[in-house]
Structure formats: C-alpha cells, structure tokens
Amino acid sequence: MLLDFLSGKHREPAECIIKVDGEEIAHLYPFLTEVHVECSRGDAWSGTLRFESRRDENGVWSVQDDPAIRPWKPIVIEAAFGTTVEEIVRGYIREVVADYPEDPGATTVTVELQDDSIAMDREHVRKAWGNEVPTTDAAILLDILSKYPLSPDPENGAGLDGLTVNQNATDIRFLRARAEANGYELILDRGLLYFGPMRLEADAQETILVYAGRDTHCFRFDVRADGHQPDAVGYDVAPETGSEPVHQDVQPDVPSLGTEPADSVDSGLSPFIWRLDRPGSVSAAELDAYARGRANELSMRVRAQGELDGSLYGHVLRVGLPVGVDGIGTTMQGIYYVDSVTHVFSVDGYRESFTLLRNAYGDNLEGGTSVLAGVL
C-alpha cells in the first residue's frame, strides 16, 4: 500500500475480478491477456475477454473446454482497489470465439459479453399497453421489469401518463423507444434500470486531477466547445382553429454545470433553433417531451475526452453521473457529466478512457477554489 502524503489517500494497484455463475474464474487468470469493457449512456454495455489457451496431454484446452466459458452464462466484472471492490458491468456471455492458427501455441479464445439488456432482447412481444385503461410509462416499466432479475432505480422519472401505446418489439427495444419518447436516458447498472432525465444534480464522483503533481491520475485530457449546436428545439402543432400550424420552441431545462452558459443567446445573432419533423402518430405531450430531451442533449456543447490511470484514481468512473475536473484552467474546469467510459485491464494496468459533457463554462467545483491551487 502506498500513501499519498499530499492527499492522505491510499493507492493500490487495481485488480480485475471476473465471476461467472457467481464463482470467480481465478483458475483462468493465468491465461487472461486483456479485459475491455465499453460503457455508454446510449448503447448496451459490452465487453471482451481475451485469453491465450493451451492443450494438455489429454487434448483438453484450458479455456474453451472450461464449462464456465459458455454463451448465456451470467458474468460480472469488478475492479478491486485494495479491500474496496466496485462493479464495472454485469450481464451474460454473448459469444465465444476460439482461434486455432497454424502455430498451436498461439491459440486464443475471445469471450464477448453484454450487459443485462441482452436477456431482455430474446422475445419479440406484441402487446397493446393501456388498451382498456390508459396507463403510464412508470407502470409499463414495472410490469416489464417483473420478468427479469432487475430492479427499477429509485431515482427513475415518472414518464408520460394517459398512454395507449403498442409494443411490437423486444422488451429492451421497446423501453429504449419509450425513453427516447420521454427525452430520457435508459441505463442498466449494478442490477438497476435507470429510466429518467440526465442526473446532473447527483453527487459528483471523485474529482479527475490533471497536472496535479504526484496526485495526477489523468494523463491525457482534451476539451472542445462546439458553438454550432442550437439553443432551442422547435416543432409545429396543429392549430385549434384555422389551418396554419403553431410553432413551439423548447428550451433546455437541465441545471447548469458551470457559472457561464455555453450557449449563443447573447451573441447578437439571430435565434439558433432547429425544428423537428412531427411523426403523425405522436401525441403533443410526447413530442414536447422528445423535443425537450433533444434540447437538453444539444445544450451539452462542451465535450472532453481523456484517460485515467484507474489504479491511481481508485474508483470505477460511472456513466450517467457528474464528475469534477480540476487542473485545466478556470474556464474549462468544473463539473462535467460522464457520457461514456472504456475500461481496459492489460499489462499496462487499469486504464479508463472517458468522454465527458458540459453545458457551461466556469469553475464550479465545491468550495470555488481549485484543489490544485499552489501546485505547479
């Protein structure tokens, strides 16, 4: 254990723990060469385990003949930081690929996995929700989740009500469509399904430190601000009288992640509004919710990318939650929103590559003063 005398934190090399059917596959670790996990707000989380494999005198291969390496086996990948263990992803083995090249000593096995959403993508369902009595998104979600070993996140949004909607898809595809209709995120993490707006006001994760001397754990970081994204999203609705459509403009309604808006409202130019085409089968309430979701997403004009030394950071950086960034100047540093994270365990250690989003400029870290003040 290494003690960081500046921060008082303990730093230990991160270890990867893999469990299949609830049992750690430690006997296969000597053959494991890389673990790669992709997590994002918009897609199913997926991962890849790469193994070398050896054949014994009885013709049995160490990895591909192991009963744990089978499609549809439940799998959990965790990161251990000393005595603290944090989950990265859980789901199922999706595919097993054994590669037998000319040299038998170079035989490899690749295991592909996907998060819990894959179990919700097996049965095509045709159902009329709210056919007898109009229903709500919250009720639909609870009904669907009752079929799976998943729980609704306590912070879920209410969604729309008064619904009569047809499902003609697998459960996960239908729920993703409902999330989009509400302007919501849909994230499966640690056995919970989150169905709600961006959680910009949640507690921030451990601050990412750039150029922080011996406390540095982010060794690559770049940030860009794209001004060519609209300040509002508009759509047309049918008038109560007459034939001319009525224009509605929807502004973002998410909290600011800084002290200065990153929009162009005060630029002195004409209003920056993008208009949506309205599908004929969408209600006015659903169109308004969708437009607001698009406006909120488009307000995230500041985008940062970088890479952490996971062992030094000491945590699994979680998607769909805020995180502070310090050491990049008073304009760009502050609270960001985690859009995606790629976790890699290899001979180089534990690396976390990330994409962060922000809708404002200015340092809004807790206390208003950089924790790196005085660090050159």
Placement of each model-derived feature along the sequence:
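Assembly/oligomerization scaffold segments
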Residues: M1-L113, I118
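Short beta-strand-centered interaction patches in the first periplasmic/extracellular domains
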Residues: L2-D4, A106-V111, D115-S117, P154-R224
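An acidic/polar, Gly/Ser/Thr-rich interaction patch typically located in mid-to-C-terminal regions
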Residues: V37, R41-Q64, T216-L376
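Short acidic/polar beta-strand-loop edge motifs in secreted extracellular
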Residues: S62, A119-D143, P152-A177, A181, ...
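Glycine-centered loop/turn motifs
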Residues: R70-V76, V210-D215, G320
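Short glycine/serine/proline-enriched coil/turn segments at secondary-structure junctions
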Residues: T84-V85, P101-P104, I187, Y194, ...
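Short, compositionally biased
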Residues: R90-Y100, R199-A202, Y336-V347
